[in-house]
Design a protein with these regions (language model features):
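Iron-sulfur-associated redox domains of electron-transfer enzymes in respiratory
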Residues: 2-181
């Protein structure tokens, strides 16, 4: 949603907006939703931890859990408990892959063993500027690439399409009619 908002700001006719104040390169993240911090803090409190205790988080593919990493170990929270922490606006957002970014990045570990893919991200290059950055990072040996499988790409497209369908359904329900869109 941030990449989409930035694209709208770049193209909007706003008095005094020359467009030169915008970044030259936009890197967007894959995102299905984000959490309300207040609700997330309450969820953590139910498990006896705070945000400061967290050293990492992950949502492993196919496990339907949120992994919370702390110095004391791993805590697995069922996604059903996390769902009520999702920000309302996310239920209406149709862009799960930062379609308006120069580069879209995310840990979509479809089509392969989840454990094998930890630490890897998928990248979608969406512009010449994005391609130049990736090529530079590879040349400087700060980025290692490997080809995503055809199955992984199909699954990513399926998940993105499903997010769009759910969001559109929620928008229609909220507006009480598709004619109001």
């Amino acid at each position: 949603c941030q990449a989409m908002a930035l694209a709208k700001m770049k193209t909007a006719e706003i008095p005094g907006n020359s467009g030169s104040d915008f970044p030259g390169l936009v890197i967007g993240l894959f995102c299905g939703w984000t959490l309300s911090m207040e609700k997330f803090h309450n969820l953590l409190a139910r498990y006896g931890i705070t945000e400061a205790d967290l050293t990492g988080m992950d949502i492993p593919a196919g496990k339907n859990i949120l992994e919370l990493f702390t110095a004391g170990g791993l805590l697995c929270v069922p996604m059903a408990e996390v769902d009520h922490c999702v920000r309302t606006a996310c239920r209406y957002c149709m862009d799960s892959t930062a379609e308006f970014a120069d580069l879209s990045v995310g840990a979509a570990r479809f089509g392969t063993d989840c454990e094998e893919m930890r630490g890897w991200n998928q990248i979608i290059v969406r512009s010449d500027r994005g391609k130049e950055l990736i090529e530079l990072a590879v040349a400087k040996q700060v980025l290692q690439l490997r080809e995503a499988s055809a199955q992984a790409l199909r699954e990513l497209k399926r998940a993105a399409a499903e997010k769009k369908k759910k969001a559109l359904k929620n928008i229609v329900e909220k507006s009480r009619s598709a004619k109001n869109l």
